[in-house]
Amino acid sequence: ELMETCPHGQLKVPSVGGGTANTEFEVLTGMSLDYFGPGEYPYKTILQQSTCESIAYNLKELGFGTHVIHNNTGTFYDRHLVFPNLGFDSFTSLEYMNHVDKNPLGWAKDTILTTEIIKSLLSTDQRDFVYAISVQPHGKYPSSPLGDEHPITVSSDVISEQDLVPFSYYVNQLYEEDAFLRSLIESLETYGEPTVLILYGDHLPSISAA
């Protein structure tokens, strides 16, 4: 539905199956990881001690408040140390969220992000840049059924029932992700200020069929 009504395109990212922080780095700074060492994470090697040009700093110069929201722990990838050096005024991580639902693998569901995004927008009188990082569909994906109900059934003529288990789990997490995005869009439409929503995927999932 969004692809039919909104601008969209392809995004080349430096990560597969993991490494969200490196995709974040490229998106926020415009710098390519090609200029860093093999396997390097700038969040680990540079940004804990040094600042770096970023879209957050650019928008701050234009009068925006800058906020990060992530429904995982703030110490993961040392984001709690990195984001101030990327120009963000505040960072709300899982530790500071209430009434968080979890998926069968224990990841926080992304529905909490809608609440936290609106809270950030309401926290200042200025224009705001809110960078939200979701976590719900993350792996490692199950190799055996978890017993939870799946509204979407996945079938294949070439993949075994056993190998379909992680695909089925992932597809149904995306189904919930669609519902979250609809809720977020509806909340932003009633927020009362002009809003630009940009969505991108950080990396493909680590799923394969034998």
Annotate each predicted stretch with a short phrase.
Residues 1-210:
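Solvent-exposed soluble domains appended to multi-pass membrane proteins
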